[in-house]
Amino acid sequence: MTSSSAGTGRADADQEAGHVGRLGHGSAGHFAGHQSAGHDSAGHDSAGVTWSGRELSASGFESDTGVADPALLAAAAQVADDPTSAAEETLLSALAGSRVLVPVVAAGERVVLPAGRVADNVAEMATPTLVGPDGRRALPVFTGVEALARWDRAARPVPMTPARAAQAAIAESCDVLLLDLGSDHAVVLRPSMLFALAMQRPWRPAHLDPHVLDAVARAVQGEPDVQRHTCEAGDHPGTGVMRIVLTLRQGLSHAEVEAVATRIGERLATDGELRARVDGLAFRVTTG
């Protein structure tokens, strides 16, 4: 993490300084023109291992009808419309108790047939990962077969728990999950949400997360120029950016103010658990 620079008084603007930076809003619009990165032309999945001879084991959802959970759909629609922290918390709670469908698509291989004809060998299957314009990797997941078919009618649904889907996404070096990509309620599930699902723990907004608040308090402790501090949500809903407001003693130079914020940011950067719970970090400095 790096700190934002600020002079004395209230900083003119926040500067995000999270371990993943600012990840964008909860809408999946940035992935609308995605490109697939889930497999290569040789029929390998994104881990580089052939799917030949592999079987999908029983998931515990053999009687699943593929219908989306109405409560989950409503929660996703609320976040897509107004991504407040409360709405996001409701969505993650609904998602944790539901199931998702992960798409499996044909990983075609170009083969040359007799007489020089070219055809696609689509015997291999793979789970796609997508790459957004900003370079983020994402695993698409869906609430039901209707949303999946809207995205890709040829994709096969594999039901699984959100925890298992999140663990698979992390194993594939994905940064986010995309919920119901292609729908009007599509939502990007940010890294903090991805890790919460994978670890099967409740997700909390960073500025309300006890672990994060304790970590910030420890990072600020021992800074004699800091009179008090608070943690609050950033200015842009749906980004997951947390703002740390530092109230410093009067009379500090610009360089001294920046040094304080830098030291605090560097301490926070060493806390791996905090990094998994905070999507972005900004500082605002005031004087007492």
Where do the language-model regions lie?
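An interfacial alpha-helical scaffold signature
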Residues: M1-G288
